[in-house]
Amino acid sequence: MNVIVIGGGASGLMAAITAAKGGHSVTLLERQARVGRKLLSTGNGRCNLTNLNMGLPYYHGQDASFIRPAFEALSLDATLDFFHGLGLLTTAEDNGRVYPYSDQAGSVVDVLRFAADAAGVTTRAGFEVTGLKKTKQGFTVLSAEETLPADRVIVCCGGMAGGKLGGTRSGYELLQSLGHSVTKLYPALVQIKTDNTFVKALKGVRANADLRLCRNRDAVAASRGEVQFTDFGVSGPAVFELSRAAATEKGPLTLHIDLLPQLSTPEIEELLRRRLSSMPELTTENLLAGVLHNRLGRTVLRYAGYGLTDPVASLSPADLRKIAGAAKDFALPVVSVLGFDGAQVTAGGIRTAEFDPKTLQSRLVPGLYAAGEVLDIDGDCGGYNLQWAWSSGYLAGLLKSGT
């Protein structure tokens, strides 16, 4: 069959390679000047291609269980075997995140390009699809310059995340033109903008912390890990984990940060009491030196309502309790999440109920398939979205007809 894959990202490359290996004539269309451009930016340029801790709880959407058949078709182990078979060496970190041993995202893109070429895929970069029509013979793919016929079409256009790297609404619009519907779309795995009264002075400071995103003190989401403070709010892996909830939850939200999760409030009080007893000549500016980053320690003191020039000997047990409490609950009112340009993934997408999970073929338009971020599935930070791309691209590329 003559197969056209629209979108040369992770899922599109996998779908094209799989379909070509199945004996089909495959053309891969990519709007950008080269395939895999967004892949080059993943994992801070290292490409976190999957995670050893894989499972349904790491995925979201109106029906997250939709992923199961794809993950049965191409499991975590099978994914690693696939990449190892292409000659890519990988390494796993303690948190389960898997990276190319080279620490270069370009290595992943290269082996996929080589595999596509070896399988006989015709890749056309710089080809912007403007329309998709169903015909009696199959499909017609439209651009400003030409039309291409296809027996089968796999839409792998990605989502709106990373607009500067090519994220657009094009995939949604193509599928909507054929009768499909899209959920509300939100940026996810993105920085959170907060009240910056205290964070502005912390730009660039990192901390390992426990985070709770709360509405009226009730947690709607929680995470643990690295937080990076910015001039507008917070970033980092632990923040990305909360960003989906921050984008979708209604009502005023507050981010509560425990800056010393390994210590209880009484333990922090005792630590400060010992410092006060042994070094009464210190000023409050240095009370938390060696406990927190210097700028963070000073900010916690200001947050708790204390100046930086008072002698620590003037602090009462109640003062120490208040300062310890501030370190355990550094609360920042949430303003918003940053937009799609800074997001790593789109939450929401084409409704999965309109596709057969066992084949990823459209229930509305026979011969039409979709995979990856364009569908209403998104994963947590840590390689989960790329695993969905690999598995869904593989299943779609099998071009199963279903029952």
Label the predicted regions.
Residues 1-11:
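Beta1/beta-strand and adjacent pyrophosphate-binding region of the FAD-binding site
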Residues 4, 20-44:
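Glycine-rich FAD pyrophosphate-binding loop
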Residues 4-6, 29, 129, 148-164, ...:
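Short hydrophobic core segments
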Residues 46-92:
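Glycine-rich active-site loop/strand segments that organize a redox cofactor
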Residues 125, 298-378:
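A glycine-rich dinucleotide-binding beta-alpha-beta segment and adjacent secondary-structure elements
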Residues 125-138:
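A conserved short coil-to-beta-strand element within the FAD-binding core of flavoproteins
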Residues 152-198:
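Glycine-rich loop(s) and the adjacent beta-strand/alpha-helix scaffold that form part
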